[in-house]
Amino acid sequence: MDHNKLYQLLIDDKFFDVVVELTDEEDVLSINAHKIILCASCEYFEKLFTLFREKNQSKITIKVPNRYVVRDIIIGFYKKNIQPCINNWKYQLDLVVCRDFLGLKINSDMIKNVIVPLEGFELLIKVIDLIGFFDETIGIIIRNIPKDYDKSILSDELLDKITNRTEVLNKNMSETESTIQFIVNSSKYQYIKLEMSHKIKYIQEFLEFMCKYDVWDNKDKFLLTVKPIDYKCPCPTKYSDVSFMIKFFTIYLEAKKVNLTN
């Protein structure tokens, strides 16, 4: 199927068989659509056009949480990606609400980077209630909870989860700040001391860099160890410190980033 042609039919108002009026608390807007596309894409519309009186109607009115967001969702049924308003916290939250209203899948990834102002926190709680309260969503709440927010408004269960998650995050942060990593090349009798704890992706890219420029060999044996921040490396004198290579790797990463943006 040519999805570009399908979307063009929507834009040109060709062969449509239903006018969908989307109304919310502020206003109403209309979109011409095709029942077969709506039914195939969304269980809400499938039931609407098969089980209820709307199945024989060419114009229907639906009261929705946000008319603009639902319009964008319908356009998405035509495989046209609408650029989400990633900097609009209200749009991000309403997208979850509207997808839930239509019976579409929702998950925490949809709001993982959302930052809401004070007036948006109550809506954030309602949205997360739809998604579910687990580590990721509790973390989103912790990141957004206002400094002077009256936590007594929240349920005891949610407060317990926030408290437990905060303790875990603080513990992980404390452990990260109090540890240091060593990469030991036992084949070359060299070691590298990292100034902070890096994720495994960084370590892998660094090893690829070292092998790419023939400093190390991909057949060498590497060992990654984590030690307390005040740990003094007791490496035998035959082991040499080549931590200066981190500076070259940093330059390499910056150059790589510039090339990707050009």
Swiss-Prot record:
InterPro entries: BTB/POZ_dom, SKP1/BTB/POZ_sf. Pfam families: BTB. Residues 16-86 form the BTB domain. Belongs to the mimivirus BTB/WD family. This is Putative BTB/POZ domain-containing protein L834. It comes from Acanthamoeba polyphaga mimivirus.
